[in-house]
Structure formats: structure tokens, C-alpha cells
Amino acid sequence: MGKVSEIYNTLLFLHEGNRRIWPLEAEDEFSEGKYDDSYISHRRKGQESLKKLKAFPEIKQRMANMARYMNEDFHETQVRLSHQLGNLTSKQVTTNVIENLESNPNSILYLIDKILDQAQAEGVSSGTLHIVSPYLFSGRYYDEEGELIYDGAQETLQFLSQNPDVKLEVITNSVMTSDNFFTQAIIDMDMAPRFLLTPEMQEIWLSSREKGEFNPDVIESEEWQRLINHPQVFIYQTGGTDSVILGGDAHYGKLHAKFIFGNSGGFVGTSNFDYRSNLYNNELGFFFFGEGVRQELIDVFEDLKSTSYRWGTPEWLEMRRKVMESDSKKAGPARKQRGTFKTIRALGLEYLM
């Protein structure tokens, strides 16, 4: 598997469209001005930052144990490498999304789709699909005539309605933990509402904070409670009202993990499952089949869930309100989410996020 990964990265980095980042052959070459590569200064800054990071006591201790760590606690697991190399040559990445997927049968999204089809064909009608991603979207694509050709949320909800014993659990960032205000606006104003709210309630939620999020007639209504407590869809966002940015003592770092697992296997890789990962980036990851790795991911998932709120619940709404009222740098972007999302959509920038 290591050899296969090496070949993948070699093909990627040697692609003619990439800029070369040559290493220094000797320490004094930079000062002599031999290299005119503008990336060198960034590489130096990166090395200095890495040096500082490794000097932290906890990191230093873990680095000292790295040799042992790399040789212990491995699991016997079936593994398959998957990639998005097809994105290197795709020209019409949004309008030809289906054709592009079918032309790259080893792509991450193609294989996920086939695995789900196979599970359905084999009569698997119960279980839970777990997804962790910092910037999770659910793709919606149109052809050149503007006709909808695929809606990820719609497809998933249809599958769930046909399989009432299947659940979907998602963990992603919140306005408190996200480092990308634009993608978080898409998550809170589009992705989660498409899974949980009716079109009418989506319109109210998106209209304004006063008419939706801060309106007791909406968030305390029986309809709202019924919608957000979907028996099969659970969307959690990391963070809590005890955070240091709200005057508490808890530290919530940004979520950056990306993995999926189901009843017997899953996927771990670089893809965020947002538009940028799906359409433009050259993502890499491994599908696995084995209980050992799966159990470790279960433990990570449950740990993350214990420090998260379910989307739409009173606790989640309270966290958002307190973030908006705080004096942190998160406050402004949280208050402006609706305007941010509407601007992104009006300018057609969703697919670049």
C-alpha cells in the first residue's frame, strides 16, 4: 500500500500543471541567492513553525515515542487506495459531474456510491453511517441547461425513507470551531436545512435572524421540534457554551478530521466532501474493511459527539447566540452568516468552496 501511495503522489506532483518546489541542496544556497523560487521563504517559515511545534512538551514526548508508535497496535485490515486524480483533466467539473465520476471508477465518490448500491442490493437495511468532516456539503449539481441532475441530500433522504432502520450521523464544525466562515455559512444555511427542514421552513430560517433563528414562534414550535429531531438524521456540531471564548474554561479546537464508517468498514482520507474536494482537488484516501480500525473510529466519533450539540436544538441555538454576542473574532461572521451565504450563491461561488 505504501508503494501504491508513492506512485499516486509521484503522478500528482509531476503533473505538468504543477509548479516545482525544489529542495535546497545545501544550507548556504539560499543566502547566496542561487534559487529564485518564491516558495523558499515560505518553506523556511514552515520549517521554523514546525521546529517550535516540536518543542512543545506534549508534542516532544510523543515525537520521542514515534519509533515505537510506528511499530505497534496495527490492525489486520483490507485496504484499497482511492483518489480524485480525474480532477486533473476534467474541464466541465460541475455540469458533467456524473460523466466524470463514471470515467474514474477508482474515485472516492464513485466507490462510496457503489458500496452503498452494493449494500442495498445485498439487502442491508439497518445500521448507521457515520461521517466526520470539517466542511461537509451535500452536493447539488445542474447541467448546462440549468436542470438539476443530482441532489445529495434528496438522494440520501429518499434512501432513508425506504430504509427506516438506517441512520445517518454527521459531525462537523460550528460557528465556534470553524476556521472557514464561508463554508460554515453553507453548512448552516444550506446543507443542514436541506436535510432537516421543509422548503417553507428553510425559507424562514434563511430570511433573517429575527424572523427565524431568534423567533420563538419558529424555534419553539412543534413543527421545528419535529423537524430537527429527525429519527434518522443526526447532524452534530462541535463546541459548547463552556468555551473559553464565551468566558468558560473549555477549549474546543477546530475539527479537521475526515472519515466515514458503517457496519463493517469505511474510508479515511483527505477529502472534506465539499465542492472543492469533490470537483477540483486531487484527494487521496483509503477504504478499509476490518473491525479493528472501525472500533478506533467509533471511539473517536463518540468522543467528538460528547463535545458537540445537535443542529437546531436549544443548546445549539444558545451556543450560536452567545458566539454572536461575544467579543471574539467569531462573532461578526456568525451574525452575518445569512448575508454571506446569499452573496456566495448570488455570485455562483458555492462550487469553489
Sequence positions of predicted segments:
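Active-site cores of enzymes that catalyze phosphoryl transfer or operate on phosphate-rich substrates
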Residues: E27, S38-L111
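Surface-exposed polar/charged interaction patches
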Residues: L14-G17, Y69-E72, N104, Q118, ...
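A Trp-anchored, charged/polar loop motif used as the substrate-binding/catalytic surface
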Residues: I98-Q120, L148-Q154
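PLD/PLD-like phosphodiesterase catalytic module centered on the HKD motif
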Residues: M1-R44, G123-H130, P134-M353
